[in-house]
Amino acid sequence: MKINKKLFIQPILLFAFMSCSSNNQFIEIDYSKNANLVTMEQQFYKSSGSGKLIAKGKNNFVSYFDFISTHNSSSIIFRDFLRRKQFLVEIVDENIRYHDMKNRKDIDIQSFNNFFPIATRMDANTYKKLMWGIPDIFNEINLTTKKEFSVSTKLISVDDRNLINELIFSFNDNVQEYKLLFLDRKFLDKE
């Protein structure tokens, strides 16, 4: 039985070409579906979850975190690579407290800023929006901050709502980068 080489080789080449082509699928985002903090707090009692902070550049580390946020209080616990508690950020109403859990003492924002340099740019509402996954978190970023770093986001659609899944802060023309990646986020319904 004689096999036509062209018929045999063409499907293989077509398969190889299709396998090597990039699969860059761009999806148009419907911003009207972005989560809204007021609406989320009306529907849910709390947001909780976990994630990791990844630093690349001059400082390289991975810190896992757990968070919980309700209407008037929130907290984030950062852990080192061995999952030991490292820092606590506690928010009650508009007050933010930073606590070094290894040394068992409160610290000021500048000390925490050495770990996470965006801290001085975040107020209580920004932390809260971050934990609830609200995409407009940095819409009102001021001009001086824009010169210091850039922010990029990746959204995920959950229950027909766009939520923040990843935030990347790039400093000094991408020499230093801090990525906040949310591994899971749960919402507890109001009863």
Regions found by a protein language model. Give the residues of each.
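Beta-strand-dominated lipid-handling architectures at cellular/organellar boundaries
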Residues: 59-63, 68-72, 88-90, 95-97, ...
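Solvent-exposed loop/turn segments connecting transmembrane beta-strands
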Residues: 56-60, 79-86, 174-175
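Short, hydrophobic/aromatic-rich segments at coil-to-beta transitions
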Residues: 43-50, 71-75, 140, 161-168
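Gly/Pro-enriched, hydrophobic low-complexity segments
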Residues: 132-191
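An acidic-aromatic
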Residues: 73-125
